[in-house]
Amino acid sequence: MPFKRFVEIGRVALINYGKDYGRLVVIVDVIDQTRALVDAPDMERSPINFKRLSLTDLKIDIKRVPKKKDLIKALEAADVKNKWAKSSWGRKLIVKKTRAALNDFDRFKIMLAKIKRAAGVRQELAKLKKTAA
């Protein structure tokens, strides 16, 4: 299977290290072989090392170094936020963030729900075994 996530202008990437960790950005220019100029609607345009970026499958159609308003229009037209939220990678990050925000009582309630669900599964399995025998 060929590699499909190339560093290119318009590629949506996820910052995986630093103060902007977890933020979706768009590559607007390639500075050199180790750095790119990235931009997002809610941040300043800044250079970032490729090692701090995780490339996604999402790509928007923009020119090199667009104005902020053009970038925002392109992001909205491509519906990047919704596509990211629907992707398995995006959903995993959302689940991870919500689990990290749980307090002790929430974790306790989840534990009780899991126990209750497992008991229900066990009862149904016992019924099926009884009817099969």
UniProtKB/Swiss-Prot annotation:
A Pfam family recorded for this sequence: Ribosomal_L14e
Gene Ontology cellular component terms for the protein in this record: cytosolic large ribosomal subunit
Domain of life: Eukaryota
Alphabetized UniProt keyword annotations: Ribonucleoprotein, Ribosomal protein
GO biological process: ribosomal large subunit biogenesis; translation
MF terms in GO: RNA binding; structural constituent of ribosome
CDD domains with a match to the protein in the record: eL14 (cd23702)
Family label: Belongs to the eukaryotic ribosomal protein eL14 family.
PANTHER family, per the entry: 60S RIBOSOMAL PROTEIN L14, LARGE RIBOSOMAL SUBUNIT PROTEIN EL14
Full protein name: Large ribosomal subunit protein eL14
Organism: Pisum sativum
